[in-house]
């Protein structure tokens, strides 16, 4: 190994007591590869195994905690005990490569396509209309409480399946973020109507997940939370609301906050100094309370090292690990110059990508670097 990259390979111990071998994580990525019923497929295992080698931690594709939370075809499910045997295979496949296995738990809310949810009954914090037609309905208070409980039950299943932790998916415009955002939450009950009330749902889920972890986990079990710091729309989340959120999450004894960005160096847009990066601002705000994971357009070993040298303790990669599953192996062996940055259509087999994910990469220009 090139000695300058040693900081990437130092172990890290979370508050919960879970220790990872290095500072590098696989970011959660949708792969469209689970079986239709949400159980884990062989294609999914074939995809995850090479990407787990020499990783500190692997965060899985998001798994829906209720049937009406399914946001993608081929999404893994964690809403029923019948999901546990497949999830156990997934956890073991990751752990056999030496990485800690973390399952991301999720509800898509109004982002769920109607054809994927029972009775095409799409739900969210508030009613949603498109050209006068209702396309999603507001959850009742009882339904909100049941979804909170479902996150706890999903955590129990993750523990029974042998995972080392869960990541609460509070990012990317899905249900948890929908409840916090003034754009999507127009409720006037205890789940909305003010900044404080809009915060109630994310915090209730954190409390429920932490409670399930303390009740069911026999050893160390980590709980992380992923968030998106800003929304482009007005009304929408700005850095001001994000500060309020991370302040509250920072008091919850979480193992980490995973800051979901397309570019780790992107600067604040509203509610904070626009000359500074969101990562710097958030690390300054809560980094002394809870470790942050940085993600977004990190490709080279130098990109990853720059994150660590900037005071962020953990780095995750998504698209780059689709392109080069052996990224960490190469850096560890001093072969960082051999890291690949583009998927070649002529070498399809070597990438171990499930067919639906391969098609998404080929057909979505500008998402993952690709050439025929």
UniProtKB/Swiss-Prot annotation:
Biological classification of the source: Bacteria, Bacillati, Bacillota, Bacilli, Bacillales
Matches recorded under Pfam families: Oxidored_FMN
Statement: the UniProt record of this protein carries the keyword Flavoprotein: yes
Organism (species): Bacillus subtilis (strain 168)
CDD domains: OYE_like_4_FMN
UniProt protein name: Probable NADH-dependent flavin oxidoreductase YqiG
Gene: yqiG
EC number(s) on file: 1.-.-.-
GO MF entries: FMN binding; oxidoreductase activity
Keywords noted in UniProt: FAD, Flavoprotein, NAD, Oxidoreductase
